[in-house]
């Protein structure tokens, strides 16, 4: 199976299945001499791990990261870093009924058509369980960014809409994000979303969400025209996350409704020999290259396909069947997509920063 790696200079390859003994990744391109321990990975992994509230899957996993290589006495050596996360709470019997049936909305059918074989236990390789190792790789990417830039680069995400109920942007407060089970920047939306998901769970159904990712402190100049544009790589990274069906950068699809004079971000002297922008419809990227403004991306996450409501499908013999997905599933998988989205943005930025350094030296201002 191809397509298991992401990145160019900063590159990671993931492996493992949802109900296998472990999942993991191998991260390449990390410069030597960067302080790194398993604890650096664990903070982000703990934000993503399941079973932390009634609004996520009740599968219990510690998601404890083990660094197997590439680090000596707490410092990176420049060699590949292997990270292992053991699976400890699999319940494969929950999937015995669908071993020969294709679940609507899942990758069951497409994996079967392509490979002629699939692992039905929890979705196997296509499960969102794989995203844990993306978060581990993203934590390493954050360390690379800080080391190369000589300063922190802030990457944060939040759920801005769930089940059609959107936040009030005037209430945006980053301090609220980690203070509630929804990663909501609007504390006033916690109660409505609780009521929404409680009802969805009772119905045996699910809802989708919109996640917004913001990267602040990105230096200008990251990105490679024409086919390795920064925004194109960000879109690919975010679209590769399970259940994501759409990505927009900056104003995104709203830009199609604007006139030219409203959409193009005007520039003025910043008094320091550079420029400042009067708006940020571009989302921090022009011509595929970062402008130095805040990078803003949004991703649409579809409703979890594993639901208790019977749906029509076919089995591996082409016969009509009804499918009900048992097991422990997220009523809104968009919640736990927040740290995953942050991680993928970190990976892209680390990759492009190393590529910039290799071609041009350090970015302007560093």
Swiss-Prot record:
Keyword annotations from UniProtKB, A to Z: Amino-acid biosynthesis, Aromatic amino acid biosynthesis, FAD, Flavoprotein, FMN, Lyase, NADP
Taxonomy, superkingdom: Bacteria
Cofactor details (free text): Reduced FMN (FMNH(2)).
Required cofactor(s): FMNH2
Residue intervals passing through the bilayer: none
Biological-process GO terms, alphabetical: amino acid biosynthetic process; aromatic amino acid family biosynthetic process; chorismate biosynthetic process
Keyword tRNA-binding: no
InterPro entries (UniProt xref): Chorismate_synth, Chorismate_synth_AroC_sf, Chorismate_synthase_CS
Database matches in PROSITE patterns: CHORISMATE_SYNTHASE_1, CHORISMATE_SYNTHASE_2, CHORISMATE_SYNTHASE_3
EC number(s) per entry: 4.2.3.5
One annotated Gene Ontology cellular component of this protein: cytosol
Catalysed reaction equations from the record: 5-O-(1-carboxyvinyl)-3-phosphoshikimate = chorismate + phosphate
Residues the entry annotates as binding FMN: 125-127, 242-243, 287, 302-306, 328
Enzyme class: lyase
Amino-acid positions noted as binding NADP(+) in the UniProt annotation, renumbered to this chain: 48, 54
Biochemical pathway: Metabolic intermediate biosynthesis; chorismate biosynthesis; chorismate from D-erythrose 4-phosphate and phosphoenolpyruvate: step 7/7
NCBIfam families according to UniProt: aroC, PRK05382.1
Family membership noted in the UniProt record: Belongs to the chorismate synthase family.
Cited function: This reaction introduces a second double bond into the aromatic ring system.
HAMAP family the UniProt entry points to: Chorismate_synth
Oligomer status and interactors: Homotetramer.
PANTHER family for the chain: CHORISMATE SYNTHASE
Protein name: Chorismate synthase
Organism: Rhodospirillum rubrum (strain ATCC 11170 / ATH 1.1.1 / DSM 467 / LMG 4362 / NCIMB 8255 / S1)
Gene: aroC
């Amino acid at each position: 199976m191809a397509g298991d790696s992401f990145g160019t200079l900063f590159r990671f390859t993931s492996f493992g299945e949802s109900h296998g003994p472990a999942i993991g990744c191998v991260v390449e391109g990390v410069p030597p001499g960067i302080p790194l321990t398993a604890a650096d990975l664990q903070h982000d992994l703990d934000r993503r791990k399941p079973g932390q509230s009634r609004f996520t899957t009740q599968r219990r996993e510690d998601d404890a990261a083990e660094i197997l290589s590439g680090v000596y006495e707490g410092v990176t050596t420049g060699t590949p870093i292997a990270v292992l996360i053991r699976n400890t709470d699999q319940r494969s019997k929950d999937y015995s009924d669908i071993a020969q049936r294709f679940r609507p909305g899942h990758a069951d059918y497409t994996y079967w058509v392509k490979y002629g074989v699939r692992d039905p236990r929890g979705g196997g390789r296509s499960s969102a369980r794989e995203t844990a190792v993306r978060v581990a790789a993203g934590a390493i990417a954050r360390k690379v960014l800080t080391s190369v830039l000589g300063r922190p680069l802030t990457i944060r995400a939040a759920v801005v809409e769930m089940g059609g109920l959107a936040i009030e942007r005037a209430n945006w407060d980053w301090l609220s994000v980690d203070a509630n089970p929804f990663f909501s920047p609007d504390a006033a939306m916690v109660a409505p979303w609780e009521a929404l998901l409680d009802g969805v769970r009772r119905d045996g159904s699910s809802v989708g969400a919109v996640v917004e990712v913001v990267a602040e402190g990105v230096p200008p100049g990251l990105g490679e025209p024409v086919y390795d544009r920064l925004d194109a790589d960000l879109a690919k990274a975010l679209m590769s996350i399970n259940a994501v069906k759409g990505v927009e950068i900056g104003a995104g699809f709203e830009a199609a409704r604007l006139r030219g004079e409203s959409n193009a971000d005007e520039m003025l002297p910043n008094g320091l020999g550079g420029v400042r922008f009067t708006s940020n419809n571009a989302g921090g990227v022009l011509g595929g290259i970062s402008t130095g403004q805040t990078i803003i991306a949004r991703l649409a996450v579809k409703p979890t396909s594993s639901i208790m409501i019977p749906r029509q499908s076919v089995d591996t013999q082409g016969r009509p069947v009804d499918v009900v997905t048992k097991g422990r599933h997220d009523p809104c998988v968009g919640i736990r997509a927040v740290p995953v989205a942050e991680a993928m943005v970190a990976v892209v930025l680390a990759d492009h920063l190393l590529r910039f350094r290799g071609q041009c030296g350090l970015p302007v201002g560093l």
